[in-house]
């Protein structure tokens, strides 16, 4: 651990001014966070008269060396960071070096501490604004104890603004609940006027953590809460989400970023949107913990550290939203149906009729020509999956779902409603409040993001010729005059899809936003490739950017939405280095990747029937001629 030292003026000026001492709860927050930063496994909090008379924090952390005690009470003195680079990747609670100095300036503060290397403890005492520090020997185990006596004794005006002892203690108790949930490994005790009020024992396993969750949020929330576990690259979301079937109105709304409790409308909106089809839950309860690369979040944007700024806020929002939606889906609470991952499937799926006029249950067209029944509703709701694994279970009853992927289809960029329970925002923001979209709007928008199926220009169109019989689930049996041939359905599907795409390429394809953008390592020359082929990329409906040596895939045309984008897009960019593909080649590339989902044989036949005669003939020429006459002759000769 770094030693305590005065921050350089340049670094001190870069740090947002702290609103450290607002009320007794503010003092408890700062001091307990210091204990946690010092590696304490136990923190005891003693309060007298709501904190106005006494606040005493005792921990078993690493302690403060004797020669740093006086320095610890100086302004802008901290062991948490020393350079501007440290400020860009903060994982500790404290970093400004203002807490002890601010607290000692409005109280009588005594700091007693001992490190493991010292044979005796030392005590520092400071009182009031003069901040003169006296250091003397003391008796104390390894760790620190801080006593704050007579808070605001020298600022009567601020003391008069304190509420009743009960109210001030309630604020302290509420803050302790928040820290108890994110630091389940810490033993926390809270005493008021000599009476133990809280005793949060360390939670070393899930069952013990659920006991702590019950203490903080109540049994109704803890027993039915859905457990969230989701990992994707440098993002990890964990915690508990209120069960949609729970009738209890929960006031548990806690969101942590790298262990720091923050107020953020982003996660509030994501939770509301995930529950959009559960109108009876106006504000579901949640305890969510987001772990993110500290370089991707700025915790130095709010004086009291209540807010953070994400470098990619939309990405974080969509990640949280998708994780919560997937958890609710797995719990069986939303009417979304997952299919298995379609990215690994290379064959066309069709509905197999038993005859030319009678259509049976859908089946899978596989390489082994086996017929596999598929539920009809799955065809309508098949969704792509990505690699992020989400594990869901009911915390109280122990119901656990299997790991599964999260969807990549996106709800659009919706305005974030203001949460009245969080922070003070400007009047301008207040006027911009937007209600959540209706169920119909969400369903309509979701339908726009489905991979297109075969469609005909006229919905009432009926093919002039009846669809031929299907052989082995892979071929149409074509009979013309004295010829009998097999036309591969897969070839027809590919050809008709190529015709459809090539016709749309002239005006440009419409890109669909990914709910969770895909990120892959970028080659050094990819930026040049993107710049050179910008028009072509936009024509295909792609939105690609490069940030921090990563290719970010934000939008794709619907035809490749179900593909392995992390593989397909880089391979395509590699090919652009050598040549610019013709429209027909682009259409074939998109069509090939679009045929990994479910399609209908009648729809393929209808699309084929609408083609011009010369194009139909080109496709029909791919039919495999059956030598039925010679076979009959052989049979007759026997």
Curated annotation (Swiss-Prot):
Belongs to the DNA mismatch repair MutL/HexB family. It holds the Pfam family DNA_mis_repair. This is DNA mismatch repair protein MutL. InterPro entries: DNA_mismatch_repair_CS, DNA_mismatch_repair_MutL, DNA_mismatch_S5_2-like, HATPase_C_sf, MutL/Mlh/PMS, MutL/Mlh/Pms-like, MutL_C, MutL_C_regsub. Residues 404-433 are annotated as: Disordered. This protein is involved in the repair of mismatches in DNA. It is required for dam-dependent methyl-directed DNA mismatch repair. May act as a 'molecular matchmaker', a protein that promotes the formation of a stable complex between two or more DNA-binding proteins in an ATP-dependent manner without itself being part of a final effector complex. It comes from Shewanella baltica (strain OS195). GO terms for cellular component: mismatch repair complex. GO terms for molecular function: ATP binding; ATP hydrolysis activity; ATP-dependent DNA damage sensor activity; mismatched DNA binding. Keywords: DNA damage, DNA repair. One of its GO terms (biological process) is mismatch repair. SMART domains: DNA_mis_repair, MutL_C. The keyword Zinc-finger does not apply. CDD domains: HATPase_MutL-MLH-PMS-like, MutL_Trans_MutL. HAMAP family: DNA_mis_repair.
């Amino acid at each position: 651990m770094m030693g305590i030292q005065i921050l350089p003026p340049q670094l001190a000026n870069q740090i947002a001014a702290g609103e450290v001492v607002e009320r007794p709860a503010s003092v408890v927050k700062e001091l307990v966070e210091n204990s946690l930063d010092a590696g304490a496994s136990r923190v005891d909090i003693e309060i007298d008269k709501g904190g106005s008379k006494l606040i005493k924090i005792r921990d078993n952390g690493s302690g403060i060396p004797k020669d740093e005690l006086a320095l610890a009470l100086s302004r802008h003195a901290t062991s948490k960071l020393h350079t501007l680079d440290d400020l860009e990747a903060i994982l500790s609670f404290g970093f400004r070096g203002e807490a002890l100095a601010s607290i000692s300036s409005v109280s009588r503060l005594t700091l007693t501490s001992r490190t493991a290397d010292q044979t005796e403890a030392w005590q520092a005492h400071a009182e009031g604004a003069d901040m003169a520090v006296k250091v003397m020997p003391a008796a104390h185990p390894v760790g620190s104890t801080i006593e704050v006596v007579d808070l605001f004794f020298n600022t009567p005006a601020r003391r008069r603004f304190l509420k009743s002892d009960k109210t001030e203690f309630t604020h302290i108790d509420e803050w302790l609940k928040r820290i108890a949930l994110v630091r389940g490994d810490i033993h926390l005790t809270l005493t008021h006027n000599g009476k133990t009020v809280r005793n949060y024992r360390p939670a070393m396993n899930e069952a013990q953590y659920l006991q702590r969750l019950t203490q903080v949020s109540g049994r109704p929330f803890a027993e039915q809460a859905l457990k969230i576990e989701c990992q994707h690259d440098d993002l990890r979301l964990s915690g508990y989400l209120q069960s949609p079937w729970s009738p209890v109105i929960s006031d548990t709304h806690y969101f942590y970023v790298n262990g720091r409790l923050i107020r953020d409308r982003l996660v509030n909106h994501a939770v509301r949107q995930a529950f959009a089809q559960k109108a009876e839950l106006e504000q579901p309860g949640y305890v969510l913990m987001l772990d993110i690369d500290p370089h991707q979040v700025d915790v130095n944007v709010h004086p009291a550290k209540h807010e953070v700024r994400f470098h990619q806020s939309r990405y974080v929002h969509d990640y949280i939203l998708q994780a919560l939606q997937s958890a609710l889906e797995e719990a069986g609470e939303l009417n979304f149906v997952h299919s298995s991952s379609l990215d690994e499937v290379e064959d066309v799926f069709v509905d197999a009729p038993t005859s030319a006029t009678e259509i049976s249950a859908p089946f899978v067209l596989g390489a082994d020509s086996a017929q596999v029944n598929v539920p009809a509703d799955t065809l309508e709701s098949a969704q792509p999956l990505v690699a992020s694994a989400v594990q869901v279970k009911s915390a109280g009853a122990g119901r656990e779902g299997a790991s599964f992927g999260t969807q990549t289809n996106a709800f659009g960029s919706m305005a974030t409603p203001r949460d009245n329970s969080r922070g003070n925002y400007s009047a301008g923001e207040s006027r911009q409040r937007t209600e959540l979209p209706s169920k119909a709007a969400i369903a309509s928008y979701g339908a726009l993001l489905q991979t297109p199926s075969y469609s005909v220009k006229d919905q009432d169109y009926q093919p002039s010729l009846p669809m031929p019989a299907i052989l082995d689930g892979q071929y149409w049996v074509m009979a013309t005059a004295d010829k009998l041939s097999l036309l591969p359905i897969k070839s027809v599907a590919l050809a008709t899809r190529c015709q459809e795409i090539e016709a749309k390429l002239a005006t440009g394809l419409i890109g669909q936003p990914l709910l969770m953008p895909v990120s892959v390592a970028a080659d050094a020359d990819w930026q040049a490739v993107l710049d050179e082929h910008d028009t072509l990329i936009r024509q295909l409906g792609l939105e690609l950017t490069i940030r921090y040596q990563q290719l970010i895939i934000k939008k794709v045309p619907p035809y490749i939405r179900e593909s392995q984008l992390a593989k397909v897009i880089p391979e395509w960019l590699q090919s652009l280095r050598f040549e610019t593909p013709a429209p027909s080649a682009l259409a074939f590339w998109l069509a090939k990747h679009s045929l990994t989902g479910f399609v209908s044989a009648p729809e393929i036949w209808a699309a084929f029937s609408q083609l011009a005669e010369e194009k139909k003939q080109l496709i029909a020429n791919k039919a495999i001629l059956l030598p039925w006459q010679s076979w009959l002759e052989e049979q007759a000769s026997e």
